[in-house]
Design a protein with these regions (language model features):
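Solvent-exposed loop/turn segments at secondary-structure junctions
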Residues: 42-47, 77, 83-88, 123-127, ...
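An active-site-proximal structural segment forming one wall of the substrate-binding cleft
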Residues: 58-76, 92-123, 130-161, 174-187
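Bacterial N-terminal signal peptides that target proteins for export
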Residues: 1-12
Length: 349
């Protein structure tokens, strides 16, 4: 390339940049917060079978008061599930302005109360029931929505990370391919923020090594991937917590569910994160098991996001929102771990 051509191209880039048409590529690396306890602020993903649904009727975005209350209690990081079909009603097309505006408000509320947000595409590796990588939902369509997410929100100071897919399942072959497409899409816009990668098998920490060897082949030009697992203590790990799940109860059940994930991370030199964990409020044995799990996570410097906070949970036994102003039993355990961390980086260590 000649010097004259280089000069002309440089001039063109400056002109495009000044007009706001050059691609934005954020390059200053941001670290993921080391706060041990965060919360899932759910509601925007309620009633996914009702599409598009109505805000305030079928799905709910937390009001500013939620952010104010939890910030005052020391919560600094929230995971915020959003639904692809509501965000992008047609594949490859523009984002829905109503849903976008509500996400804007979410990030603004978080900024106001000094909280960090992980945007979580809460879709189980599917769009309208069709798996990514199928004829109906191409890998390129998945990359498109993540690129649009990054383009829309990468400049917001409250956005701390992208969780590029919640709980992929029954997709051993497709998920690593999709994940690479998702990483590439985000990195075409934002090389600063971490990308959280969940695992096939509903992101189960216990099943992680069985289904996720291929994730070790993922490439990130920013070298800022974090693997994110989920931990529930009931028999099938699905978070239903039936009475039979207390038969032959083991207070270390959470630690046993966690260990395969921790071992995998250490073996391969990867960083880890727990995107969901939670217990019901109807038996103190679950609280004791959660306490033990959190002590183990604190030792390893692995942050964990409780499922769940947010509006309109009703009598859902895992919910952490106060009832008539009274804290839920789970909070007595969680608040023990809501304090400044001595961890300098994410573990395990």
């Amino acid at each position: 390339m000649t010097l004259r051509l280089k000069s002309a191209l440089a001039t063109l880039f400056v002109l495009l940049f000044s007009l706001g048409t050059a691609p934005a590529l954020q390059a200053d690396t941001r670290d993921f917060p080391t706060d041990l306890i965060g919360l899932n602020f759910s509601g925007a993903g309620f009633a996914p079978q009702v599409l598009p649904g109505k805000p305030g009727t079928n799905y709910f975005f937390p009001e500013a008061s939620h952010y104010r209350r939890w910030s005052a209690k020391g919560i600094r990081v929230i995971r915020f599930p959003i639904i692809w079909e509501r965000l992008q009603p047609q594949l490859g097309k523009d984002l829905d302005p109503t849903y976008v505006k509500l996400i804007d408000q979410t990030l603004d509320n978080a900024k106001r109360y000094r909280m960090n947000v992980v945007l979580d595409l809460h879709n189980y590796m599917r769009y309208r029931g069709q798996i990514i990588g199928s004829q109906a939902v191409s890998y390129q369509a998945y990359a498109d929505v993540l690129r649009r997410i990054a383009q829309r929100w990468h400049g917001h100071p409250a956005l701390v990370a992208y969780d590029i897919m919640n709980e992929p399942h029954d997709a051993v072959e497709q998920w690593p391919i999709a994940a690479q497409h998702g990483i590439d899409a985000v990195r075409s816009v934002d090389r600063a923020r971490p990308i959280l990668v969940e695992g096939n098998g509903w992101s189960s920490s216990y099943l992680w090594p069985r289904y996720n060897a291929k994730l070790l082949e993922l490439k990130d030009p920013a070298d800022n991937l974090i693997f994110s697992a989920h931990v529930y203590f009931d028999n099938d790990g699905g978070g239903k917590y039936l009475k039979k799940d207390l038969t032959a109860f083991d207070p270390d059940v959470g630690i046993r569910r966690l260990e395969p994930f921790i071992t995998w991370l250490k073996q391969h030199g990867k960083r880890g994160h727990i995107g969901e964990f939670g217990v019901p409020d109807n038996d103190p044995r679950w609280l004791a098991a959660m306490d033990r799990l959190l002590a183990r996570l604190r030792k390893e410097c692995i942050p964990a996001m409780y499922w769940a906070a947010g509006p309109n949970w009703g009598d859902y036994p895992l919910a952490i929102e106060p009832v008539n102003g009274k804290p839920r039993p789970q909070w007595a355990v969680l608040q023990k771990y809501v304090k400044p961390s001595d961890c300098e980086t994410l573990g395990p260590r």
